[in-house]
Amino acid sequence: MLLLPAISLAVPDTLSGPEISLKDHFIVKNNLNPSARAARARSMMMPISRNVDRLAANADSILPFSISIEDTVISDLRERLERTRLPDQLEGSSWEYGTELDYLKALLDYWQHDFDWRAQESMLNAFDHYMTVIDDLSLHFIHQQSANEEAIPLLLVHGWPGSVSEFSKIIGPMADPEAHDGIAADSFHVIAPSLPGFGFSGKPTQPGMNPEKIALLLAKLMQRLGYERYALAGGDWGAIINWHLANHFPERLIGLHSNMMLAGQPDDPSQRDQIEPEEAVLVQARRAFMRNEIGYQQIQGTKPQTLGYSLADSPAGLAAWIVEKFHGWSDLDQGPDGNLDEVFTKDELLTNISIYWFTNTITSSTRIYYENRNVPASKPFGFIDVPTGAAIFPAELYMVPRAWAEAAFDLRHWTVMEKGGHFAALEQPVLYLEDVRNFFQLLRQ
């Protein structure tokens, strides 16, 4: 165990002046693209601060990027874990009060003694990462290009409490399907950004970064990358952000795939009442379940800064806050017999949690709930005239009847899955990938 002689207090950021930053703990990296290789050769001869200056000076610049967490930051994490003070738990209780104590103890012990961040860092760095600045905000993204010239550009958008690590099992098969038992016709150029305030992207310094504004930023990113038309996929906030993209720029989109469909009641009674019996049972069951799951939304939607002081300073608190969502929103028994280790490995969970910890973005990421609640969209939603496909996983948080989705979207594809939950790309990557491929095969024809 590595120890530090002193521990600095980690405090969540507050909204302040403009920020253009690559973050002190990260470095630029090489890429297969010849121009990127040349850029890397130049960048390695100058300090990080000058690379930051290059981004700030050239509004259209895109620099290769690599994740490289400093040893002292990892040591600080282990020291904090060593000093963890845990609460008690009621006898006979499990997850119904929140994160189960014995599970958290095991997770924290693994994080402190056995979790190999460098291995996970290397896994993530196997993808092609970049950084650019859009509207004075540094934006990190993976851009995994396919060798197939006919590949569809796919903007793959995560949510909360996720990150780009959610997509680590599907980016390779999407960009290079032939290397993963697929066919070249299913190729995608994958663009997977860290949302503003999440992970390796910059933190908004002014109020107002709601999902619509994020969508407009991502539209600018796709323009900067030279994609005139592209496709969308994602869940959670990613689904909502993509909804805004489709609402603003339907002419730019090839198609929209979602694993969290959202639609209100149609005005037409014939559509509103067109609910299959099995749909009604599932919708009601998920609504009942969500009544016990929305407490976090009330906190993050009203006082995210107050919550942040605890989570930014305690890795145990951060892990408990995030892992409870992975337990509650996944397809497993929610009682004492449910085993989260059978759904996600500890490495998968801790890679995502570590990204939040190392970047100190738990507070900035939760503000999206506040901004969504308090900053109305500038363009009301109408019918989404973009070919849309939906993957309906049984443990998804929100469910709508198919007829309601058809009233709101140009619905071309609807798959009801036998298993899986909210974090579909990580929990059921084979099913998720197959459904994305099947939907876009319809549009390629």
Stretches with model-predicted labels:
Residues 151-159:
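Short beta-strand element of the alpha/beta-hydrolase
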